[in-house]
């Protein structure tokens, strides 16, 4: 059985979209704040082109003989594609170990929050020169938005994608939710 499907069937984790940072912040406290151990964080925010920009930044950094951890979503074929740690993808075993640690917290989380925590736990142990995160569908309340001081935020094209998650359906509201300011 595929690891993502196992998560989807888990009693504590769910597939629903629920934009709220309270759950992940509580989990981070209980995990000892792995996000505070990350330095040189670059966040890629917006609607279209985030993955391409992230991948190009990764290749640029690696081309300059520096290491980078990246978190992308969704994965194309295998869940481990979401987690690049320096010179390799996380293995299924490493992902499962992190999920077990998250399960022990007994906090109901979304699958996206669980996968964000998997990344933060492992990136905090990897000690790379840079960390690059791809934002989820709405940045302001996205579980990746827990880094206090990223060194850069790269904003790509913003459009009216994911309007179904917003009360007001204006481009200004989309910009506010996707970028968190402006």
Language model regions located:
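Hydrophobic positions on the alpha1 helix immediately C-terminal to the Walker A/P-loop
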Residues: 52-56
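Membrane-proximal helix-turn-helix segments that form the acceptor-binding/catalytic region
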Residues: 175-182
């Amino acid at each position: 059985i595929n690891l993502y499907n196992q998560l989807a069937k888990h009693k504590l984790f769910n597939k629903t979209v629920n934009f709220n940072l309270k759950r992940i912040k509580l989990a981070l406290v209980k995990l000892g704040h792995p996000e505070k151990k990350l330095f040189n964080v670059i966040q890629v925010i917006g609607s279209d082109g985030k993955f391409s920009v992230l991948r190009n930044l990764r290749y640029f950094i690696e081309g300059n003989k520096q290491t980078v951890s990246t978190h992308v979503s969704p994965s194309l074929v295998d869940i481990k594609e979401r987690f690049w740690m320096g010179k390799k993808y996380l293995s299924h075993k490493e992902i499962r170990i992190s999920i077990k640690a998250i399960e022990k917290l007994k906090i109901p989380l979304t699958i996206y929050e669980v996968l964000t925590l998997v990344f933060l736990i492992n990136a905090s142990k990897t000690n790379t020169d840079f960390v690059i995160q791809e934002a989820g569908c709405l940045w302001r309340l996205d579980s990746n938005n827990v880094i206090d001081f990223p060194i850069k935020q790269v904003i790509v094209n913003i459009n009216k994608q994911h309007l179904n998650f917003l009360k007001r359906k204006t481009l200004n509201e989309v910009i506010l939710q996707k970028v968190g300011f402006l």
